[in-house]
Every structure is written in structure tokens, then in C-alpha cells.
Amino acid sequence: MNVVENIRYNVPLPLFCLLIILSGCNFREVLDDYPVSGVQITLDWTGVAENLPETVRVIFYPKDAEGRKVDGYLPAAGGEMKVPPGNYAMIVYNYSTECVCIEGDECYGTIRAYTERCIGMDAGEDMIWSPEDFYVVALDDVEIAKSEAAMVMKLKPERVVSSYSFAVKVDGVENISAVVCYVSGLNGGYFLGRRLCTLAEV
């Protein structure tokens, strides 16, 4: 009698565990089947003879409330990314720069490039490091359709840093061991999506 009662009590337990496992598998399939489309990105660096970047960062900012931000890194020549279908704003910029830093990258309108502060001859001076070459692609409206074939995007990054040369005449050079100079009135940063420099000068 005791044997029969134990069997009747224990049989439902394995069935209950199996139900939990199957439910977890079904949920996993829903996540794995989230629809994405391929985006084949090709970058044209014509005219960039020196200091070609090794890596670029690509960000798709959703313009729909239910969309998801997609962030990835590609070789300088480009590559393929997987993006859910939808409407996006898009940013591409050269990555792994020594001086240029990025902040505010949670939104298309706030992502900003800048350089860190540095200490000049006078500790009270407000100075920043000179930026290296920085290239950007900013697209306000990109539609990613649901498709089995990859969408092809051919992009040409734009240089957003200007270079200037200065000649300094020094008298009595035999008595000088070093010369330090700096330029004032420079912009403190650059908004990638808005294509605007910050108003604050350094």
C-alpha cells in the first residue's frame, strides 16, 4: 500500500520539471528568432593617404520608440552588421584615437567628440590636447527593410578636423633650449550627429 502511494505522489514531479524545460526552450527560440537584416557597409577612404584608421565604430540610433540601438565595430574597409528592420539615424567614426574622446553616445543628438584637458606652462591656463585626424559619417534617416539579402551602403567619411601650419621667428636661438606655443579660440568639441562645433572656445 505504501509503495502504490509513493508512486502516485512522485509521478507528477518529473512531468512538472519537463514542462519547465520545454517552456524555457520555447522562450529561447523567441529570442533567437528576433528579426534582423544584414547591412553591408563599404567605406571609401579616397584622399586619405596617411594615417588610415584600423577600426571604425558604427552606431544605429532607432527613431521609433520600440526600436533598439545597435552598436558595433568594423575594419576600416567596412563589413556587415545585423540590424533589426526599422528607421534609424546612423553614425560612423574612426575608432582607437589617442587624443579624441567620445561622450554622450546614448543619443544621436548628443554624441560629441572632444579632447582631454592638459596642463600648460601656467597651471591656470585652460588648454586641451590637439586632436588627430577624425572622420565622421552622419546620416539622419536610414530605413532598414526586412530582407534576406544584405542592404549595401557605400559611405565616404568626412574629415572634421582642420590642420593649420604656423611659422615662428625666434631671435637669439642659441640661448633657447625649448619653445612652447599654443593657439586660443579653438572649439572645445564637435557634435557628430548635429554636425556642429560646441559654442565654448578654448
For each of these PLM feature ranges, what is it?
Residues 46-78:
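Post-signal-peptide N-terminal segment of Sec-exported extracytoplasmic proteins
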Residues 42-53, 167-175:
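Structural motif
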Residues 2-13:
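Bacterial N-terminal signal peptides that target proteins for export
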Residues 26-29:
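Bacterial signal peptide processing site
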Residues 21-24:
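C-terminal motif of bacterial Sec signal peptides marking the signal peptidase cleavage site
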Residues 66-160:
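Short, low-hydrophobicity acidic/polar segments
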Residues 33-46, 158-163:
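Short coil/turn motif common to extracellular beta-sandwich-like domains
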Residues 167-202:
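Short helix-loop boundary/capping segments
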